[in-house]
């Protein structure tokens, strides 16, 4: 259903005279591609760029060395995982999501196996979702590796549905930016979204086999964007349906759960999510013979990553689940 403005002169990637890359050096002032903005109109972490800010406004603990290739996943706790499971709605046009409880229960177990402290919230109104998210953002995540949030609901392009109304995902994830939740700064914040993003169908295409087959120095501190280290994994691409079996759960969630259980401690997360894509793309096809237009349709998940390092869950000692 569903002209340029000048920024501060921070830059990276220039070459020193000997040809080595000096990743921490400054270059001349950069320009944005935004139209008609002025420094006074820019919003930085909830305040205009021209507004005076406290000296420690955007200072947080460094969880890993500046150019580390992997996230630090050896904190005392894995972290908090929130699951928002929507089956019934107050909105007349939205049908109940039979089969979603299978997804929620099995995803909870998969998260727990990775060491997360999991809480499941069923059929929440938007105000309750924001309440739970706000409470999670207020926690001290200093001793946590990361954060995970899963939303299982109806959706359309750009929107998700709570029990009583629609909302945008950024209403949720902005709570966990470095501005509002500094103890998660520099740590992975993972969002898994099972919902339609439109009403288009993917009929797929049949493939036939042819004749032939063809490091820099560490520093004591560094600055990161407040929106860094997020990952959003969606069950389908923008504009398209997302499929769910009323007995077995949704294609995407079941594929995600199987990969987390089988390879969650073996592969890095982006590799794992690539194989989630593979499972959904190859192992599923809609079975709606009574409605030919809907029958034998396909689906492909997609993701948006602002991660800045490799993420591997690895083993977490028992008893260290609490976030």
From Swiss-Prot:
The protein's Enzyme Commission number: 3.4.22.-
Entry keywords, A to Z: Apoptosis, Hydrolase, Protease, Thiol protease, Zymogen
Propeptide segment residues: 1-33, 203-215
InterPro entries in the record: Caspase-like_dom_sf, Caspase_cys_AS, Caspase_his_AS, Pept_C14, Pept_C14_caspase, Pept_C14_p10, Pept_C14_p20, Pept_C14A
GO cellular component, one term: neuronal ribonucleoprotein granule
Molecular function as annotated in GO: BIR domain binding; cysteine-type endopeptidase activity
Residues the record marks as active site: 154, 196
Known role: Involved in the activation cascade of caspases responsible for apoptosis execution. Proteolytically cleaves poly(ADP-ribose) polymerase (PARP). Loss of zygotic DCP-1 function causes larval lethality and melanotic tumors.
Subunit comment: Heterotetramer that consists of two anti-parallel arranged heterodimers, each one formed by a 22 kDa (p22) and a 13 kDa (p13) subunit.
Protein family (similarity comment): Belongs to the peptidase C14A family.
Protein name according to UniProt: Caspase-1
Species: Drosophila melanogaster
Gene giving rise to this polypeptide: Dcp-1
